[in-house]
């Protein structure tokens, strides 16, 4: 006990020395939690966070006011917390609501309620994160539209095979330390919460090119993020070291947690747009087997999942705040109730890992995690999963393979909810018992996944077989190590085509079925609306096209001035790179708005035939502008007057005035030195700018504006800042320099 007290004292001294505790004020987490945070949401304009709490009981000394803190994700629940409250509210028994001014740093922080006792704040609630980061997203699309669940982990950067095989889902492995890397030739410095992080610009550009190519080939892209156990530099700050190959993300430390936040924030920005969209992020590999694949320092399952759930939450909030439909996945293997090391901390059963993870995640704000599951056959060598003896029919099954995959999907539906999706992210079948059996096993497994609504994709793990697999007796590839196509290669190619069931019926003889329609969810009509294997592939994706409106050039914004008439700009669709015009038979055009009022108007271009996807183009109808009448200067002020047509006054919200004392006027003055005044009154036709500096020359210009709602967020539509209607004058008479004593001469 004395030793424990000594350790605690040493830790507290270290924390205070590090400046984590403010002098004279501390916040202490309470043992009991009479207050429960029940909701934590940010508004769509990113200006306010609303936190709702339920007061179940009043602890002695709580008083009548509660205080809300935002703390970093790595701060433990039972730790002393630094900082000042971000909000306060009076409370009674029942519900209390906090309104907080949103800051970007809060995206990956958690909120805690406390009461004040002297100079201390005593925490009386658990922690909650923002649970709707998608409200902040700038990209709300879903990316490539797929028609099947067929996917592949391709050979590194091999687009040819993906295209030839008509693959609709691609899973890639990316090394974190190769991206976050200061030892590179072309550095990109990224600032996050006051600190600098160095990324390999060339590597990121190359990855963006790869993603763009896969998207253009008709595939959704998913990425497995892997951190090497020997990672160095800033990436090494997140690594535990040890284990066999990979490390879990060390979010239990302040520097590791902040680095992970910065990394995911950067990746979300780079891969959260339509052209370079990563549709899903898989955190680590088979996290229920930490020693082999996701080492976390030999922690207990509870401590390990504290760390992992924190990393998951950060990735979730960072990615969805940029791309609203992006997903985050936990990676799990097939050892459902099988603990490989018998109670040690090197391996955990899949079910216990999932349960513990979701419990930790849900406790700090309910979100919907997704699962990247590896459904290999029992023992990995024997392909016939329907003979797997350890794969039972109930939730107490030892393992879960393709034989009993419905046990997993039903469990997840009940445990997490029907919105959770399961990606079968890695499985392959051995060909040692014949290529026909390998092909039949793949077809059988794929049809099971196609018939199960909770499974979103089925990813085959090997294209070309690596020598490392062969050395272990695994002949899993669609192609052997020499590149020869096995029978499963062609089965993979046709598996989701209109002819699928006919092309694979000869493989039934190698299974325990007499018809593929014996599989739940598979009917003769299952693939009838799919594309024929005879038709062209890949379909041209919307990301490979651009749209011209009327007389616009390339993708320049098109703007009309309000005149009460409808404006429907003509649409022309062209191919990227070549500029070739797409025939009108390959798309339909629909104007989604009235095309008359002041605001942002949208056109939907729906592709068809050999083209896939939908393009939304926007154009603007802006208000008529005001005309400056006069600029009257004094020594420290300027009175601006203007006029505007009566009809325009009725249409607008008000005016914006810009002024600057920059030498070059508005042409060359930095934006930070141009001042803006917003007047929310369309009837006001005069304004006095105060606080000017005597002797300086000021430039003034004006525009009308109207505030409209776009995607639920207010947007100001301005008439435009013209360069013709600018007035300028001095705050007093300028100081005129003495003339030169010598006359100027012409040479």
PLM region spans:
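Beta-strand-rich modules
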Residues: 109-118, 689-710
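Serine/threonine-rich, repeat-prone extracellular segments and beta-strand-based repeat modules
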Residues: 579-612
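Pro/Thr/Ser/Gly-rich low-complexity, intrinsically disordered linker/stalk tracts
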Residues: 32-46, 623-650, 694, 712-738
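Noncatalytic carbohydrate-binding groove/subsite architecture in carbohydrate-active enzymes
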Residues: 304-436
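Solvent-exposed loop/turn segments flanking beta-strands in beta-repeat/beta-sandwich domains
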Residues: 58-74, 78, 645-670
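Recognizes extended acidic, P/S/T-rich segments that occur
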Residues: 79-102, 656-693, 707-709
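Substrate-binding cleft and catalytic face of glycoside hydrolase catalytic domains
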Residues: 165-340, 378-379, 465-470
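Aromatic-rich peripheral "rim/lid" segments of glycoside hydrolase catalytic domains that contact
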Residues: 273, 292, 433-539
């Amino acid at each position: 006990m004395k030793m424990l007290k000594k350790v605690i004292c040493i830790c507290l001294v270290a924390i205070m020395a590090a400046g984590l505790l403010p002098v004279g004020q501390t916040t202490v987490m309470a043992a009991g939690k009479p207050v429960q945070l029940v909701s934590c949401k940010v508004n769509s304009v990113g200006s306010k966070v609303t936190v709702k709490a339920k007061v179940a009981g009043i602890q002695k000394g709580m008083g009548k006011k509660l205080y809300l803190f935002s703390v970093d994700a790595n701060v433990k629940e039972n730790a002393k917390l630094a900082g000042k409250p971000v909000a306060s509210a009076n409370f009674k028994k029942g519900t209390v609501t906090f309104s907080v001014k949103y800051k970007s740093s809060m995206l990956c922080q958690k909120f805690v309620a406390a009461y004040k006792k002297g100079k201390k704040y005593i925490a009386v609630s658990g922690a909650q994160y923002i649970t709707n980061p998608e409200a902040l997203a700038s990209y709300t699309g879903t990316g490539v539209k797929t028609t099947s669940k067929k996917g592949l982990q391709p050979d590194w950067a091999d687009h040819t095979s993906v295209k030839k095989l008509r693959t609709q889902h691609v899973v890639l492995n990316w090394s974190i330390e190769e991206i976050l890397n200061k030892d590179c030739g072309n550095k990109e410095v990224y600032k996050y919460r006051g600190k600098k992080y160095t990324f390999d610009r060339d590597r990121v550009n190359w990855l963006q090119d790869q993603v763009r190519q896969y998207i253009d080939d008709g595939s959704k892209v998913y990425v497995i993020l892997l951190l090497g156990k020997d990672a160095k530099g800033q990436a090494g700050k997140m690594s535990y070291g040890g284990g066999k190959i990979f490390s879990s993300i060390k979010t239990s430390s302040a520097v590791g947690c902040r680095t992970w936040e910065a990394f995911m924030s950067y990746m979300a920005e780079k891969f959260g747009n339509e052209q370079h969209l990563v549709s899903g992020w898989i955190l680590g590999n088979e996290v229920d087997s930490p020693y082999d694949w996701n080492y976390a320092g030999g922690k207990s399952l509870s401590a390990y999942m504290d760390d992992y759930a924190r990393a998951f939450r950060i990735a979730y909030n960072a990615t969805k705040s940029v791309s609203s439909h992006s997903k985050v996945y936990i990676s799990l293997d097939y050892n459902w109730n099988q603990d490989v090391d018998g109670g040690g901390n090197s391996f955990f059963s899949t079910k216990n890992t999932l349960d513990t993870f979701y419990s930790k995640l849900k406790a700090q704000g309910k979100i919907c995690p997704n699962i990247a599951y590896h459904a290999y056959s029992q023992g990995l060598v024997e392909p016939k999963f329907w003979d797997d003896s350890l794969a039972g029919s109930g939730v107490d099954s030892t393992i879960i393979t393709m034989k009993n995959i419905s046990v997993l999907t039903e469990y997840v539906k009940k445990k997490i909810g029907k919105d959770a999706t399961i990606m079968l992210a890695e499985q392959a079948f051995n060909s040692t018992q014949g290529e026909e059996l390998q092909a039949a096993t793949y077809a059988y497994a794929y049809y099971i996944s196609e018939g199960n609504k909770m499974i979103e994709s089925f990813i085959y793990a090997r294209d070309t077989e690596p020598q490392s697999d062969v050395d272990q007796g695994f002949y899993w590839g669609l192609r052997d190590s020499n590149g020869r196509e096995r029978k499963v290669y062609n089965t993979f190619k046709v598996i989701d085509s209109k002819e699928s069931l006919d092309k694979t019926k000869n493989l039934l003889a190698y299974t325990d079925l007499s018809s593929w329609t014996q599989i739940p969810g598979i009917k003769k009509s299952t693939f009838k609306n799919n594309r024929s294997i005879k038709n062209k592939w890949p379909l041209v994706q919307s990301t490979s096209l651009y749209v011209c409106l009327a007389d616009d050039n390339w993708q320049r914004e098109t703007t009309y001035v309000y005149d009460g008439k409808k404006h429907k700009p003509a649409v022309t669709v062209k191919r990227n790179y070549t500029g070739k015009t797409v025939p009108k038979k390959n798309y339909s055009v629909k104007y989604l708005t009235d095309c008359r009022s002041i605001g942002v108007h949208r056109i939907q271009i729906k592709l068809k035939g050999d083209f896939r996807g939908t393009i939304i183009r926007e154009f603007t109808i802006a208000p008529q502008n005001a005309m400056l009448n006069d600029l009257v200067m004094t020594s420290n002020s300027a009175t601006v007057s203007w006029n505007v047509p009566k009809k325009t006054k009725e249409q607008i919200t008000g005016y914006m005035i810009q002024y600057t004392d920059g030498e070059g006027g508005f042409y060359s003055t930095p934006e930070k030195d141009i001042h803006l005044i917003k007047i929310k009154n369309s009837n006001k036709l005069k304004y006095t700018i105060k606080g000017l500096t005597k002797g300086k020359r000021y430039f003034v210009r004006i525009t009308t504006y109207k505030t409209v709602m776009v995607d639920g967020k207010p947007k100001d539509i301005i008439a435009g800042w013209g360069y013709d209607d600018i007035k300028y004058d001095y705050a007093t008479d300028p100081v005129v320099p003495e003339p030169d004593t010598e006359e100027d001469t012409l040479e």
